Every structure is written in C-alpha cells, then in structure tokens.
C-alpha cells in the first residue's frame, strides 16, 4: 500500500502569499543592483536617489529586499514543519494587517483619485501605485490572511494532541 502525503491546510494560500511577496521583493533587488526600470512608478525621489548612486541607498534597498523575502518565506516554511511557532503566526498576523491596510488604502485611494479626476493614470507614480505596488501588497496580505485563517484549525488540533 502506497502512502500519500497530504498537504497541510492552507498550503496553496501560503504558496500564493510567498509568490506575491517574492514578486514584490524582486524589484527591490533589481534596484539595489542599480536598475532603473519601473522606478519612476515609485516616485521622483526614488529615481533621483538611484541616479546619485549613494551607497546608503543600496543598503536601504538591501534591507527592504531582505525584509520582503523574509516576510514572504518565513510563514510558508514555518507552516510546512508543524507545529507552527506561535511567534511566527503573531508576526504574520501583524504583517497581514500592515499589508492589507497599506495595500488596500493605496489601491482604494489611487482609484478614488483617478475616478474623481484628481489624478491621472498617465502619471507613472499614480499608475504604479494604483495598478501594481498597492494591489500586490493587498494580494499578498489577503493570501497570507487566508492561509493563516485556514491553517489555524490544524494548529489547534496539533496542540491538543
């Protein structure tokens, strides 16, 4: 008889959240290495700092990259080896609040400004935050929220055993 390995509940959502986080981290790495593509969607100050090529900016981008990769992978890796650590889940829930809050506000505010005519998607920074960066934060947060919610029952069952 062949044993089949089943995935812990929430695994597809954890994978989706990790992918969204890594997609958000990739441009930070690219910019850290000196790239300019899509930087105008972040803002003119980011473009100016990148053109100046200051070493502290590179270190800041490295820190942002490491934080995003850590935030993307640690909850997923912790989920795969039960029981999940309580501190990882607590920090992940805080991350969910930040990601959904920041991403939701940015997405909603961007669309609200475009719909009311206060801003135009012709401006790279408005388009970038309305179409790309904020929705990606929101998606990352929603996927992680779903993963943590679905996996909570498993955590309770493992703790009770």
Which residues are covered by each model-predicted region?
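Cytosolic juxtamembrane helix and N-cap/initiation of the first transmembrane helix
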Residues: 1-24
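Short, membrane-exposed interhelical loops at transmembrane-helix boundaries
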Residues: 44-47, 115-129
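Hydrophobic transmembrane helix segments
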Residues: 24-59
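Cytoplasmic juxtamembrane regions at transmembrane-helix boundaries
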Residues: 2-10, 74-97, 154-161
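Hydrophobic alpha-helical transmembrane segments
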Residues: 61-76
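Individual transmembrane alpha-helices with interfacial aromatic-anchor signatures
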Residues: 59, 122-140
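C-terminal TM-helix exit segments that contain a strictly Trp-centered aromatic cap at the helix terminus
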Residues: 23-35, 97-113
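Membrane-water interface at the C-terminal end of transmembrane alpha helices
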Residues: 135-155
